[in-house]
């Protein structure tokens, strides 16, 4: 319906350009939005306010001319001018229910489009250090990143999911020292325990597996433990592989799969880090000072130059990041989205500066970043900080075990990425209307229950057929439900374009609320079979949209609860 209103306004604008009311050499694009107050109609447009200067007349006078020039259309019941010149459209009841047929015809494809036209997009997310179990912050990144991938795919993009393993650097040495200490029988309470060693129970698990000579497989790589307490390199290799496997198992339990696992260590092994250094030097963007090598990042918007290579010859963490992103570009990804925690904020400018200094024809502002804020977990109103398994933080596995995958994924994606999130375990476990994922799933299950009752009476209802005369639907609640359903395709497009999956959770919560209100107020299993069938058609459309939306969130749509 919004497209219909936009087309009518475009026609009216063209008419006013033809008669000289508006200049013919300018383009005008009406922005049509949903109204918040239904007394103002279903859709509103401010084009008269935007174009009034070009017309040389007050906005309200231009609005009157536009309304007069609108073509006749049976979908529009009436048009009103409000305030200084807003144009409000009231759609006919019959037109509102056309969306029901569309939904039932398109089924799982409803809401999808091909605007991406198959463009390749790489989304990097989670990318945790292989030094321990995934914490709840990684979980938020996984929920947001995977939902964003699903949204992009729903808009016709060819998406590659990538996980970058930081398997080189000081944190890996600390991991090796920690496991080696456990292998030798030490505990964190011993004086000789590594100063920056990891203390969680999972270190004991790694040590025991190493001593037992276990073989672990992490994605496509197999590592067998040597069981030698003195071979720190072997311990390091095994510990990284073991924890990568554990992270993979956590992600599998979370319903997240990756297409590519990229190892930081491979950048060194393949000479890509050194090649990046040489290219930056050749381009004249490096200098030596105080025994270190610096990159002139200030020439690309950074607030100060950054150390690339330290006095001891080791590279700072942002240099392999630059090499890694050059590799992404060379793989042909012109659109790259990095979903990371907000603690990576300082790396954005540095990485982009390094990429510009490479002179590789990479656009300024590439890649895109989606940075999420921290997560606080609470139980009984008190913050939960410690997991026995991890030692110092709450893990993704903890949440899945407590509340299940569906609730964990939904809650972690339910807020703006730039807002801090409080994960209330008690709320996520509750079976009440206050729990949004339960409330939404219950709407789906309720509709399935109605269909089962009809089937028990010998009345079968297909998923992709309109079974009733929709003109019999005359209630305001029915029209509001239809209007809410009609918003879904635009919501999917905007959520992907804006990189904001939380809009989908809010939409589904609102749709479920409208359905429950309607369900409680108006029976569907009634003697008037014609009206019953019309309402069942509306039910089927609601069920389909809820199922489609939950699927994009990676959440199930149960038929029974």
From Swiss-Prot:
Keywords (A to Z) from UniProt: Aminoacyl-tRNA synthetase, ATP-binding, Cytoplasm, Ligase, Nucleotide-binding, Protein biosynthesis
Catalyzed reactions per annotation: tRNA(Arg) + L-arginine + ATP = L-arginyl-tRNA(Arg) + AMP + diphosphate
Region forming the signal peptide: none
Keyword Aminoacyl-tRNA synthetase belongs to the record: yes
Gene Ontology CC annotations of this record: cytoplasm
Transmembrane portions of the chain: none
Biological process according to GO: arginyl-tRNA aminoacylation
Compartments, as annotated in UniProt: Cytoplasm
A GO molecular function held by the record: arginine-tRNA ligase activity
Name of one Pfam family that matches: tRNA-synt_1d
EC number: 6.1.1.19
Domain of life where this protein originates: Bacteria
InterPro entries: aa-tRNA-synth_I_CS, Arg-tRNA-ligase, Arg-tRNA-synth_N, Arg-tRNA-synth_N_sf, ArgRS_core, DALR_anticod-bd, Rossmann-like_a/b/a_fold, tRNAsynth_Ia_anticodon-bd
Placement of sequence motif 'HIGH' region: 128-138
Subunit structure, interactors included: Monomer.
NCBIfam families: argS
Similarity comment text for this entry: Belongs to the class-I aminoacyl-tRNA synthetase family.
Protein name according to UniProt: Arginine--tRNA ligase
Organism classification: Bacteria, Pseudomonadati, Pseudomonadota, Gammaproteobacteria, Pseudomonadales
């Amino acid at each position: 319906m919004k497209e219909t209103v936009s087309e009518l306004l475009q026609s009216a604008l063209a008419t006013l350009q033809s008669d000289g009311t508006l200049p013919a050499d300018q383009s005008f694009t009406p922005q049509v939005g949903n109204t918040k107050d239904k007394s103002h109609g279903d859709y509103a447009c401010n084009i008269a306010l935007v174009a009034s200067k070009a017309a040389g007349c007050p906005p309200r006078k231009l609005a009157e001319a536009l309304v007069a020039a609108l073509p006749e259309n049976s979908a529009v019941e009436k048009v009103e001018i409000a305030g200084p010149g807003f144009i409000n459209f009231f759609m006919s009841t019959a037109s509102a229910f056309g969306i029901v047929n569309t939904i039932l015809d398109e089924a799982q494809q409803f809401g999808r489009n091909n605007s991406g036209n198959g463009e390749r997009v790489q989304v990097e997310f989670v990318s945790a250090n292989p030094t321990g179990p995934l914490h709840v912050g990684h979980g938020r990144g996984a929920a947001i990143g995977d939902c964003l991938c699903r949204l992009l795919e729903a808009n016709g993009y060819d998406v590659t999911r990538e996980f970058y393993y930081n398997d080189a650097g000081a944190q890996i040495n600390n991991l090796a020292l920690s496991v080696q200490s456990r292998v030798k029988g030490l505990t964190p309470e011993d004086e000789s325990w590594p100063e920056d060693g990891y203390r969680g129970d999972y270190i004991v698990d790694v040590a025991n597996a190493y001593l037992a000579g276990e073989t672990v497989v992490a994605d496509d790589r197999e590592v067998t433990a040597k069981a030698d307490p003195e071979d720190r390199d072997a311990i390091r290799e095994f510990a990284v592989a073991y924890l990568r496997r554990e992270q993979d198992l956590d992600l599998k339990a979370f319903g997240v799969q990756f297409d590519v696992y990229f190892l930081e260590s491979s950048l060194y092994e393949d000479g890509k880090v050194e090649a990046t250094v040489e290219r930056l030097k050749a381009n004249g963007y490096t200098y030596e000072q105080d025994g270190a090598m610096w990159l002139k990042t200030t020439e690309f918007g950074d607030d100060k130059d950054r150390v690339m290579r330290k006095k001891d010859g080791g590279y700072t963490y942002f240099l392999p990041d630059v090499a890694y992103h050059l590799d992404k570009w060379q793989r042909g990804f012109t659109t790259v989205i990095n979903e990371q925690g907000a603690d990576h904020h300082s790396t954005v400018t540095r990485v982009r500066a390094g990429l510009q200094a490479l002179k590789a024809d990479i656009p300024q502002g590439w890649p895109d970043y989606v940075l999420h804020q921290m997560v606080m977990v609470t139980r009984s109103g008190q913050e939960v900080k410690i997991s026995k398994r991890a030692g110092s933080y709450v893990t993704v596995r903890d949440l899945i075990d407590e509340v299940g995958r569906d609730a964990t994924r939904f809650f972690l994606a339910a807020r703006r990425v730039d807002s801090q999130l409080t994960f209330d375990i008690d709320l996520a476990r509750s079976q009440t209307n206050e729990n949004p994922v339960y409330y939404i799933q219950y709407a789906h299950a309720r509709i399935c229950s109605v269909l089962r009752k009809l089937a028990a009476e010998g009345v079968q209802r297909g998923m992709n057929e309109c079974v009733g005369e929709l003109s019999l639907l005359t209630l305001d609640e029915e029209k509001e439900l239809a209007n809410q359903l009609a918003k879904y395709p635009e919501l999917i497009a905007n959520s992907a374009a804006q990189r904001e999956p939380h809009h989908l959770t809010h939409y589904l919560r609102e749709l479920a609320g409208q359905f429950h209100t309607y369900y409680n107020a108006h029976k569907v299993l009634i003697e008037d079979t014609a009206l019953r069938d019309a309402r069942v058609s509306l039910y089927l459309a609601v069920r389909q949209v809820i199922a489609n939306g939950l699927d994009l969130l990676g959440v199930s749509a149960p038929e029974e609860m």
